[in-house]
């Protein structure tokens, strides 16, 4: 099953990749490995202003932060679909995923998972 179709089956709507703003490529393929640049929680385009920003939990609720993380992963999946030409999802492996949360100083009072 194609990756996009699997995500649709899981009720995950994956938009087209967001156009980069700046001098970088959104992904690069080296020796069969896909390196995807960091994604931000934006819906639509970065210039549209539909981006979630702020520190958790002082400026952004934990619930909003979870939604932001979900948006970042969906944006990553969009690039993965493009980079793999929407290949079958069982042919794709993952080596590493990193995520970053903007929180207050040493704030460990919340969990995003």
Predicted regions located by residue number:
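Short, polar/acidic, helix-capping and beta-turn segments at strand->helix junctions
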Residues: 1-113
């Amino acid at each position: 099953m194609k990756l996009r179709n699997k995500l649709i089956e899981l009720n995950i709507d994956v938009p087209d990749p967001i156009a980069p703003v700046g001098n970088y490529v959104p992904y690069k393929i080296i020796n069969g490995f896909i390196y995807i640049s960091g994604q931000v929680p934006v819906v639509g385009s970065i210039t549209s202003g539909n981006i979630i920003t702020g520190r958790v939990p002082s400026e952004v609720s934990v619930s909003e932060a979870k939604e932001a993380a979900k948006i970042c992963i969906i944006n990553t999946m969009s690039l993965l679909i493009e980079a793999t030409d929407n290949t079958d999802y069982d042919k794709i492996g993952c080596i590493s995923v990193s995520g970053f949360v903007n929180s207050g100083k040493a704030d460990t009072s919340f969990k995003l998972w």
